[in-house]
Amino acid sequence: MRPFHAYSWIFSQQYMGTKNVKEKNPTIYSFDDEEKRNENKSFLKVLCSKRGVLPIIGILYIILNGNLGYNGSSSSGVQFTDRCSRNLYGETLPVNPYADSENPIVVSQVFGLPFEKPTFTLESPPDIDHTNILGFNEKFMTDVNRYRYSNNYEAIPHISEFNPLIVDKVLFDYNEKVDNLGRSGGDIIKKMQTLWDEIMDINKRKYDSLKEKLQKTYSQYKVQYDMPKEAYESKWTQCIKLIDQGGENLEERLNSQFKNWYRQKYLNLEEYRRLTVLNQIAWKALSNQIQYSCRKIMNSDISSFKHINELKSLEHRAAKAAEAEMKKRAQKPKKKKSRRGWLCCGGGDIETVEPQQEEPVQTVQEQQVNEYGDILPSLRASITNSAINYYDTVKDGVYLDHETSDALYTDEDLLFDLEKQKYMDMLDTSEEESVEENEEEHTVDDEHVEEHTADDEHVEEPTVADDEHVEEPTVADEHVEEPTVAEEHVEEPTVAEEHVEEPASDVQQTSEAAPTIEIPDTLYYDILGVGVNADMNEITERYFKLAENYYPYQRSGSTVFHNFRKVNEAYQVLGDIDKKRWYNKYGYDGIKQVNFMNPSIFYLLSSLEKFKDFTGTPQIVTLLRFFFEKRLSMNDLENKSEHLLKFMEQYQKEREAHVSEYLLNILQPCIAGDSKWNVPIITKLEGLKGSRFDIPILESLRWIFKHVAKTHLKKSSKSAKKLQQRTQANKQELANINNNLMSTLKEYLGSSEQMNSITYNFENINSNVDNGNQSKNISDLSYTDQKEILEKIVSYIVDISLYDIENTALNAAEQLLSDNSVDEKTLKKRAQSLKKLSSIMERYAGGKRNDKKSKNFDTKDIVGYIMHGISTINTEMKNQNENVPEHVQHNAEENVEHDAEENVEHDAEENVEHDAEENVEHDAEENVEHDAEENVEENVEEVEENVEENVEENVEENVEEVEENVEENVEENVEENVEENVEENVEENVEENVEENVEEYDEENVEEVEENVEENVEENVEENVEENVEEVEENVEENVEENVEENVEENVEENVEEYDEENVEEHNEEYDE
């Protein structure tokens, strides 16, 4: 057989004939030629035997072959007729033209083929970002090639907006050429390439014309929306980039697919027709996607330009109204002078008095109504279309989640509404003043007797009006006086002024050195005791100082809790850049819609964020703050989970880079050889000591830094294995905890009404009390159920934060020790410095056992305060809503205090036991570890000396002696220290805890507490002693093995060298002899 050559004339003659295709490639459409030959063999012999028959048959064959046959390459062997071929190129597609056909047929994608299903439908287009045009092309080429024998028209997106594929005259003529391919003769192979280039040029010209059409359309945006030139050029440049990238990429993909098909040995004409139609579908799909993407890009932030234009018009109107008002006031002295002359002279020329200019004010009012109703939606309408704050409209069925709305009610929208309200107040005030002045003028005209007094009043009026006009545009008096929560809430924070004002004096002196910012309200600055120019570090430091002072004493009275609550409110506002900007500009009006969290929950999240230099802000803290501050339900959070995950992925990379950079900064002095490099680190850790969950966080950081450093030093296999095992275990546990947390939050915080138990704001105080539906609400549960649920939630949050912290610290440390821009020697120094940092942290961590106990204690402690905050805030809300008299409020406060005392009694035993156990175990462990370390060091030195002399003989004996010495020393020291420490610590801790927490309790309860404490202490001490002994033995064995191995190697090398030298000398002596 000849080798294949796709471009030769011989190939076209050999493989493009119907007869050859029938013989070599029979299909289901061809007849069985052999059977027909056998049946008609005798009949052919009879015909051929007669004269004149053969020439007649030959002529008929030529005629019929020219009219009915075709010169194609179809592997099916079926003649190309309308009955059994595809009609893909008609201008209108029939519903089902082959429904009554008995023969096998090949149809288009409208009817589908067996086992061929589209990857998506028009109702659910592919989830690809509108700026990712290359990703769209890749997805489209996969979908459009879904069918093997037909084309997938459903892959064309956005057909409801930009129309499907329409076959115009140019495409219709081209499809006719493809249908008639081979009928006119010639080289079909070359014709295929020519026609492919032709359809590519047709579609590229259409695509280029689309670019001109879009540019012409969007160039009108500059005039229509007064879009800045820079913004327009930036958006259009992005569109041009998408158009060029998409066109080049699609052309390359289509040409590549055609060339791969064109190089095959057997070319199917039907497959070629499918490829030409695929070309048309592909360019149409890309055109639709480009139009959609450009529309999204050009329409983004279009509301901002509308807002700017609206504010400009409002500002112009306000200035115009003010100018008219000033002219009117300037004309008042002339009017008064003319009235005095008329009154004195008994009448005068009335026509000399100029008419009052009331028309501009009326037109301003009409324009205000028209523009507010027609041009810009109200604040309520904006919130109705919001995609984030739609919790209040979902239940009413008003929310429409459609891409055309683009109605995220952002911070910019809120600022715009506040700014607009300011100008509206200015216009309303100017109109009211003009009306009042007109009324006063009429009363002056009527009251002739009080002429002089009236004149005096009118002379003084303009100055007062000027002052009012100057003050009102900042913030209207109505908005300043009304929203003050209640006189209790505003005045009570001043109780903390004794604690606030004294330390604030130094702070304010430094902050007031800069130019003072003029703000309408400084209440929150006064609560934190900082100046209005204070930076974020100063505000944060001051918040933690005040919060840690008030936190332990919340239950002692309503005043302390109120101070703690106000401190948290102040930091929620001033600690956030956007809220601080609103507060500085608009005062109380700017934060009326801010949703404040339960103070203890906010303190919990802030405490987890306190270690952000080493860990960054944990992801769960960021998500929960967004969750609570926006008052989103769990259903809302699930709807926005994809966008949040994308944001958190990007944030995680920045977070790891920040931690890695911070580690490098604090370790650089150690790398450089500074002996005092650890002083600032110890100061930093001392400042973090005592925070909520400080021990678990430091223990996680210590463990990660230690083993990551070891993986980059000698004997890294064990640490690498431990890291891998811990990472896998964390992933499994994290998945389970995430599911548990989500299910718990969904059950108790699944709706906006359920969120009212832990959030509140100043504008909708009443709505925070009612719970219209029958869903579970934390505030409605019993004390035991509340405690159980909240302990679960807090425990889940802390566990997720710890796993997140470990993962972040691991990645940041790996980045630090895998820097390609640094040599190996420097990387080794970094690893050694990181290991030293973990040793410093170990002093503050306290070990794994203290880690768990401290976490459980902090969890129970903070849950108690959360419950106290929920009950207190709900009581205040109900009292304000029902206008309860003062004596009822007093009784409510007494009830709250009584409940707090009961809670203290309930938790007192746990606190006493916990403190006693911690102190006893801590002292016992310190003494055991200290004595064990001294003994181990002495014994190891003895072991090393003995090993140098006789390695093989003395190793076993020394190890046994070490173990015996360690056990004896440990037992002796532990028994002595434990007895002394138990007696001292138990007596001290029991007396202190009993005096502080159980002064009001009965003597019987105190005795029970003491007995329980002694029993628990004895049990825990015995367990801890055994565990310490086991740990010491393990450490001794590891140290001995390491030292033994090193010494053995050294001794072996020395012995080998001495032995070799002696043998050489003996050999030389023998040789000389």
Curated annotation (Swiss-Prot):
Keywords: Cell membrane, Glycoprotein, Malaria, Membrane, Repeat, Signal. This is Ring-infected erythrocyte surface antigen. It is a peripheral membrane protein. Residues 891-1073 are annotated as: Tandem repeats 2. It is found in: Cell membrane. It comes from Plasmodium falciparum (isolate FC27 / Papua New Guinea). One of its GO terms (cellular component) is plasma membrane. The gene is RESA. The lineage of its organism: Eukaryota, Sar, Alveolata, Apicomplexa, Aconoidasida. InterPro entries: DnaJ_domain, DnaJ_domain_CS, DnaJ_X, EMIR, J_dom_sf, PRESA_N, PRESA_N_sf.
